[in-house]
Amino acid sequence: MEKLKPNDVEKLEVIKDLVDQFIDLMLNYRQSGHPGGSRSKVHMFLSSLLSGYVRYDLRDPAKTFNDRIILAAGHTIPLVYSTLAVFNEAMRLRYEETKDERYLPKKPESTLYPKDLLNFRRRGGLPGHAEMGGKTLLLKFNTGPSGHGITASVGEAFALKRMGLNDVKVVVFEGDAGLTPGGAHETMNSAWALGLDNLFFLIDWNNFGIDDHPLTETVPNTPNEWFGSHNWRVVGTIKGNDFPDVFDVVNSLFTDIQKNIPNIAYFKTRKGRDYLKYDNKSHGAPHPMNSEIFWQTKIPF
């Protein structure tokens, strides 16, 4: 894939801004949820979905042979809800303009639109953690706790390989704190031992979980050592909130594949990017409803 052109970056920045606003408004209205990790993953999530490498059909997310997308950091589900709201609203508007039925969803009742964000974490509304169902059939596993989704990803990737479906990828989005459970190391070992070159991790390396101290005070080294010591192919950038750099890494992740070697890309970010509440303080803690600091976050937009 060619490098991003300036016009492409401008478009991605607009999409990112819209996703950011939906995350903020949804959580401020509900007064619950996780803004920090949701915001820090926006660049890598959008770059992956819009790269052309991840195969999915927005109109039919349950379609056979779609890539298996897993939000291992299931508590950052506001990221997915907000992204789907932007994408599906764009498709709806394009249909209104053109009347071209290619823009229509296969099942409107399973399509997430901006109005659905108002029912986040409410009875009958959008769940507080990632679920493979309802309006998020794009996702292929129910997740929430740290390390939960990454272990399941090995099972899915192995099953696909056994069925001969080597071109169906398992694409996993996780934060660095989600790699601290013991199951993460078993996952890394198993993925390499099973030759899962169809497995792709994208790691939000923001150096914070829920604790006051940075991750590096208890977990030494970097993603290069964490995964490289298990013989994974590692690529990454220290500019994880910069679209040109992120896109280059995504391009490398999905093209420079080595036979039987699992793949991981890391993106150095700031948890709570542009939310004016950072690091662990942004974990599970939206700004008070209609507070002055909340509206300060809207000024750049």
Give names to the regions the model predicted.
Residues 8, 16, 30, 172-173, ...:
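A short, structure-level motif marking secondary-structure boundaries and short turns
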Residues 16-32, 204:
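N-terminal capping segment at the start of a domain
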Residues 35-36, 70, 264-267:
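A structural signal for short, well-ordered beta-strand segments and their strand-loop junctions
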